A protein has these predicted regions:
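Extracellular carbohydrate-recognition regions
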Residues: 23-64, 148-155
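Extracellular-facing segments of soluble proteins and assemblies that are Gly/Ser/Thr-biased and enriched
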Residues: 104-154, 158
């Protein structure tokens, strides 16, 4: 995702901030997971109806009126109901507000399938920072600990979006060349970081399942314990490279046990 110009340059963080005011909303529990009272779980795509553009519990996550939105919808694919994303020089996502304590639900599991890589995509360069798939987790925290630059970004986000910027986010991405476990930082703020979990073409066109300990990933990336999880999101973007891409997302869930 790349945004040009002084106003457009904060669109990613503005998009993340969009859900800052939604943190207190609790989604119904996901089938098959026992969730403590007062906590939410991720609504599964597999229980949505084919043709639905907005699965129950999920919200559109548009970055800017100047940027085309990626199209999402529930489809039947290989005998399963999954979320399909189609990006055409576009960038947007879907998100679900949550209220989860990482120490109680430390593990996130998801599935995705990518038909092809995005030519020219390079999330390290800041020029072609697109990814066919992203799973994004946002966290609350003590914003008084943010440095001057991050406070300035937060104020700008508040000005442009009317929403508070989350304390921190992790984006799990598929990269063209960088090896798995590579950590990348957002160009404008240290409070949004990417973690490469898949790279290169070797496992294209197949369903891949990932399970991550968000506590461990957060500790490694931010050097402190993770605060409450306030939303989970998915995003497929191709606007930086001016290309088209598609991808499939299976159910996402948080769980207690490894």
């Amino acid at each position: 995702m790349k945004f040009r110009g002084s106003a457009a340059g904060i669109c990613v963080t503005c998009a993340i901030a969009f859900v800052g005011g939604c943190a207190n909303r609790v989604a119904p529990p996901m089938k098959g997971i026992t969730v403590a009272a007062g906590y939410g779980a991720v609504q599964p795509f597999s229980l949505a109806r084919p043709g639905e553009a907005m699965p129950v519990g999920w919200e559109a996550w548009n970055l800017s009126r100047f940027i085309a939105s990626t199209r999402y919808g529930i489809v039947e694919h290989e005998g399963e109901r999954v979320l399909m994303a189609n990006a055409d020089i576009s960038a947007s996502g879907l998100l679900q507000p949550l209220k989860l304590v990482p120490s109680e639900y430390p593990f996130i599991t998801w599935r995705w399938k990518v038909p092809q890589l995005i030519p020219g995509a390079d999330n390290a360069s800041g020029v072609g920072d697109d990814s066919p798939v992203r799973v994004i987790v946002a966290f609350d925290g003590d914003k008084s600990k943010l440095d001057f630059e991050d406070h300035a970004v937060a104020r700008t986000v508040k000005l442009f979006s009317g929403r508070e910027m989350p304390y921190a986010t992790i984006q799990y991405i598929w990269e063209n060349k960088l090896p798995p476990e590579t950590v990348l930082e957002h160009a404008r703020t240290g409070r949004s970081k990417m973690l490469v979990v898949e790279s290169g073409p070797a496992r294209l066109n197949q369903w891949l399942t990932f399970k991550r300990d968000v506590r461990a990933d957060y500790q490694r990336m931010y050097g402190e314990p993770a605060g409450p999880i306030i939303f989970v999101g998915v995003m497929t973007d191709s606007n930086s490279t001016g290309t088209k891409t598609s991808a499939y997302y299976g159910d996402i869930r948080f769980s207690r046990e490894e």
